[in-house]
């Protein structure tokens, strides 16, 4: 935990001279990582599920708005399922998190992002599985006619690949561990749709239940990206590792030490604070998406016989 910019975020986005030396020393390993990732994806067995399968992914490790994007577009359709890995959940294998809004498991079993999707998408079913093909097959079993795949670019599926591109890219366009890319930056050319922040979509934020002295508490990737949306009433920032669970006793200690009047958290963090007795303010994030982007996704979905305009 740190209250300033985390080391890894500095390393990938604003490296010091010493960190730059380390980056170039590790570059040969980045080339190996890149080669393995590309070969693994392109040589994997091809799967065709015969329904619209839309992958909302990114080339960069960590958060880039995939969950908010799915939250924004999934309600536009009927008979939808979302398939995700379920990061940092305490379960293994395939788990049905919800069926058309009926939540079947607790947050710890689902993972924070999948649980957030289940809470907000009342018309959709949410499934988590390390093996995405099993998740898609379960979605079909549940009657889904459209499936959104959270972070599915690296899978060799017959799917519509939408890649989110951040407004501020990493300092170097290298793969891990010298950079933050999981595949070559040239892979953007392989996507059906590249969706760029501030060009194809805008982030719209608001704060529910604001107070005069808010303590920011978050466990998301690249947390300093929230800085542009924070009000002056934030008295301190506490950053935790992405997807980390919160120590409620530690939060209570920091709360009183800083004379805070509420904890400011994101919607993703909120699902892990259901047992927190401290006052909570919520930083709500929504996306305003260019209609042309939505039209391209609609056209793909309508290209399948199982879907009609009435389903949109």
From Swiss-Prot:
The gene is lpxK. This is Tetraacyldisaccharide 4'-kinase. The keyword ATP-binding applies. One of its GO terms (biological process) is lipopolysaccharide core region biosynthetic process. Its EC number is 2.7.1.130. One of its GO terms (cellular component) is plasma membrane. Keywords: ATP-binding, Kinase, Lipid A biosynthesis, Lipid biosynthesis, Lipid metabolism, Nucleotide-binding, Transferase. HAMAP family: LpxK. One of its GO terms (molecular function) is ATP binding. Transfers the gamma-phosphate of ATP to the 4'-position of a tetraacyldisaccharide 1-phosphate intermediate (termed DS-1-P) to form tetraacyldisaccharide 1,4'-bis-phosphate (lipid IVA). ATP binds at residues 60-67. It comes from the Bacteria. It catalyses: a lipid A disaccharide + ATP = a lipid IVA + ADP + H(+).
